[in-house]
Amino acid sequence: LANANKLENFPFFSPDGKQLYFCTCDRIDSLPQQFSNIKYRICSIGFDPQNNQFSKQVDTLIDLTNAGKSVTLPSISPDGQFIACSAAPHGCFSSWIPESDLYLYNTKTKKLIAATEWNSPEAESCTTWSSNSRWVIFSSRREDGIYNRLYIAHIDSVGNLSKPFLLPQRDPTYNQRNLKAYN
């Protein structure tokens, strides 16, 4: 499965265990000089859990390289219907890149949409799903461009998105005192 000519990371299985998803890009040997050329895609490969074998076919699901973007930090909803991910101009540490935005891939329709209701002029990244697949928590620097804060937003079963709101903290200064990033 590994390819010496590629950089591969962020692997995760589908909830049913029959697909392995991962990020991949062409290997760049002159880092950090060519860091801006790193553009990841999200791929999948079938997996047979009964026989513990991968299929031979790797499919590219999300590829924004022609749009000049790198897609990373994917997470799948527990019902397996949506993959949330971050897209940024390069690399894989999107929480540090202001242009980083969230996207959603519908595994049933094979459509990718920008999560415009969730995005801001600052970085959004690092998604996680509720157990019922209807809520997403993600990090955003929208408040000040410096500190990540956690936002929560609703998504319905067909992919309609609600406006996110700041995840309440007992102490409103918690994020500024403790962390610059959730990753």
Segments from the language model and where they lie:
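Sequence signature of WD/YWTD-type beta-propeller architectures
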Residues: 1-183
